[in-house]
Amino acid sequence: MKLLCAGVPFLLALCTLSAACSSNKAALRNDSGSPNDKASEVIHQSRQGAEKVTEFDLNHDGKPDVWEYTVKSKTAEGKEYDRLVRKEMDINWDGKVDVVRHYDENEQISKEELDLDFDGKIDQWNYYEKGVLVRKERDLDFNGKPDLWIYYEKGHIVRKERDTNHSGKVNYWEYWENDHVDRIGEDLNGDGQVDRWTKNPNPGG
């Protein structure tokens, strides 16, 4: 059976960067510009509005590796604090942003953007609800548009969808049960409907 890739292994450096941010010596960066929401554009986003940017040099090469963006906010008790809204990371030490994490009002991750081929553009989008991963979108042909969608429930894959002919429409579906593919649906005529189902003869393997 044809199975879709479950995801791209994350570089060990990403974990190191995330864990070390809170304790590393910080320096402020003055930066301004407008945000860019287009998927085909560069992954780096300039400081927006009243955001404050703090830089971290984790490998001590004199260049920043992590950028934390915060805004002034208040707790329920009215106490002011710097709320994290976005974090950018350079995980291969080339001076370019490779990962961007967005955070909600509770400072839980809500979205993650990744540059998998290190060309400065977004290739994967991860979406979270209350800090829990619910969907991944991948741009497999690097044209700035997702063509693979992976859906999660309680940390497990439940469905994958794929645009295999670059038509902009899903024409391939995988339904998962107990961490294995249960059945595959294929659209053979481009009408957006499943024309052929294939049952996995060995769903536990």
Can you annotate each of these PLM segments?
Residues 21-205:
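Calcium-binding acidic motifs and repeat modules
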